[in-house]
Amino acid sequence: LTQDATGTMAYLEFEAMGVPRVKTERSVAYIDHNTLQNGFMNMDDHRFIGSVAKKHGIYFSRPGNGICHQVHLERFGVPGKTLIGSDSHTPTGGGIGMIAIGAGGMDVAVAMGGGTYYITCPKVVKVNLTGKLSPWVAAKDVILEVLRRLSVKGGVGKVIEYCGEGVKTLSVPERATITNMGAELGATSSIFPSDEITLSFLKAQGREDVWTPLAADPDAVYDEEVDINLSELVPMAACPHSPDNVKPCTELEGMKIDQVCIGSCTNSSLLDMLKVAHILKGKTVHPDVQLSIAPGSKQVLNMLAENGALATMIDAGARILESACGPCIGMGQSPNSKGISLRTFNRN
């Protein structure tokens, strides 16, 4: 997996190897980061990446098609497979049962050329989930709780494995939200089992043929264990200037905000968007607040249009952005001077 912020250098390195076609089962080049054309450079990069994809047997996802991790989950994620990507949030794929790792462009180029990707053998941390999320508590609160306990350095050199009865209460998009932000833990990767919920997601995508059940061995030994009762979690938010500076929303209630941005590879699934539409229905965005919403993929955008949720968002006064990374990587929607921005993104 590559994207256009890191892909240009990765493909220059790949072409320098002189390999005629990629030797991976599948390689995908996504254009989702630098999608605002303020000058010729971004478009030149997109044209270059597209030409490399055509020449070397790489799938090409054009601008506006969606955020790489959301689209990859929908179209290409396969339980039990390995994935490396030139993007730190590649572990999103762990939500579908992949070992997905963010890597450098050179490492990804070497892998596409048939070379080996080496990592130091990671420690494995078991996160045992019990109970069920209460109303208004989301999957984001699960990973925020992990960050609160372990810190942004707590996952370095480790793979986070989610287990327990609570796993069965989480959909694939919710699991992907949690594994996505394993990057903020500094983890090598994060992974969920592949079960009937995974199969249901793949059936909805018309890809049930790639499903395989995967779970931890009953006698598996872990380097660390963390227990989280989902029923005890409350709505939380990460405050400036670190994802592990987590506080319950009750401590933030009443704070005046200037901007709300919803989307990114962490929270742009159909499930996330339908929650937003439900909250906005029959309401109007406050005149002093700017609300921007970026669906994670064309698939999500089309489904929102079909079920009326998109109209609900527009009627409420939301600005609908392109299906891309957008404000998360600073591509537009900068807040006002000394403004307070509330975002569903994985970085703050």
Question: Where are each of the predicted segments found?
Answer:
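Fe-S-dependent hydro-lyases/dehydratases of central metabolism
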Residues: 1-348
